A protein has these predicted regions:
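Short acidic-hydrophobic, aromatic-tinged amphipathic segments that line or gate anion-handling sites
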Residues: 193-198, 297-302
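A structural motif shared across PLP-dependent enzymes of the aminotransferase-like
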Residues: 98-111
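C-terminal capping/lid region of NAD(P)-dependent oxidoreductase domains
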Residues: 3-4, 254, 279-296, 304-326
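Glycine-rich beta-strand-centered segment in the early N-terminal region that forms part
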Residues: 25-41, 49, 53-101
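Mid-domain Rossmann-like dinucleotide-binding core that forms the NAD(H)/NADP(H) cofactor-binding site
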Residues: 122-197
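Glycine-rich phosphate-binding loop and adjacent beta-alpha segment
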Residues: 218-283, 325-326
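Helix N-cap at the beta1-alpha1 junction of Rossmann-like dinucleotide-binding domains, i.e.
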Residues: 181-183, 214, 237
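A short acidic, Gly/Pro-enriched loop at the edge of an enzyme's catalytic core
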Residues: 200-207
Length: 326
């Protein structure tokens, strides 16, 4: 097979991305060549990377599986790619697959790095898989119980996926807390409740914080009941965070716990591989209600401008921004 060229999105330096051409290697017997149809922007992490806010202490731990280059740049970053296998083992030829690959028109990876989409999962929706994997891991860390009152502070893509999953547990009452009233519509489509911070229900058995801002963390601590868990799912990068541990934090014996998808949650780690976890996440994407989380789409050629817009705005209500390839 003649080697092909591909285009990839590179962060040249903080605040500036561009499309670059590169030549693909010929796939070996245990590799596949994938033609990309869609990719998803993981807004929280990718905009933080775009702004050059990865702390020096985290540059190795925050590497994406198929990242090229290094932080702060030039770096090729991303981890939510969906496409069609056009070369490789016969069992995979023509199959629709998900891969933790950056934004690129075509790529060659080991065959074990792609995951065949389950029946009933559209390619366009599969870009949510990486964020849903984060949500799955968060709930493993949080360990909600039947009948729990659960508050999710921060109605971004990950927070809403956490709420959607938790809302499927029998007896659990889930409320998404966000400063943007416009989030009410999407929460209702996902079958969970909504409140602005000042009207949020307190005495929550479990609070999951995913807003990425210190005010949201303060709200999360305020809503927690006696001896409740507050799970911190936000990643702040270089941002210094003011954690309000005064007031009733100690008298209520609250547990503030972190969760990060880079490791399988402790309770599951001895039995679950990362591959099993992502395949579970893909299998959960059959619900059409999740399409409400993909609020925007743009062609691949527009990706550098899209990243700049998302990274430069805190008021933009975009959830998952899908990139489409032709």
């Amino acid at each position: 097979m003649t080697a092909l060229s591909a285009q990839a999105c590179w962060l040249v330096e903080p605040g500036r991305a561009e499309l670059r051409s590169e030549t693909l290697p010929k796939p070996t017997a245990d590799q596949v060549q994938v033609r990309t149809l869609h990719s998803g922007i993981s807004r929280g992490t990718e905009t933080l990377v775009f702004r050059g806010e990865v702390p020096a202490s985290e540059v190795e731990r925050m590497r994406a599986p198929f990242q090229s280059g290094d932080f702060p740049g030039p770096v090729k970053y991303g981890y939510s790619s969906v496409g069609i296998v056009e070369a490789g083992p016969a069992a995979l030829l023509g199959r629709s697959v998900f891969c933790l690959f950056p934004h690129q028109t075509r790529y060659v990876v080991p065959a074990v790095a792609v995951h065949v989409l389950p029946d009933g999962v559209p390619l366009a929706r599969a870009v949510l898989a990486a964020n849903l994997e984060t949500a799955v891991n968060a709930l493993w860390d949080a360990a909600p119980r039947l009948g729990d009152r659960i508050s999710v502070v921060g109605g971004g893509t990950v927070g809403l996926l956490v709420a959607w999953l938790a809302g499927r547990m029998p007896g659990c009452v889930v409320e998404v807390v966000d400063t943007h009233v416009a989030r009410r519509e999407v929460t209702e489509r996902l079958g969970v409740n909504f409140a602005v911070p000042e009207a949020a229900r307190d005495e929550a058995d479990l609070v999951i914080h995913a807003s990425g801002c210190t005010e949201g963390l303060a709200t999360a601590l305020r809503l927690a009941a006696f001896e409740a868990i507050v799970l911190e799912l936000s990643w702040y990068g270089k941002l210094a965070v003011n954690v309000p541990l005064g007031g009733a934090f100690h008298s209520r014996r609250l547990l503030l716990k972190s969760s990060q998808v880079g490791q399988v949650a402790t309770a599951q780690r001895s039995r679950w591989s990362r591959r099993r976890r992502i395949e579970l996440s893909l299998s959960l994407l059959t619900d059409p209600a999740l399409d409400a989380l993909i609020t925007d789409a743009a062609p691949f050629a527009a990706l550098p401008a899209v990243l700049a817009r998302l990274a430069g705005s805190t008021s933009d209500l975009t959830l998952c921004h899908r990139i489409d390839y032709t």
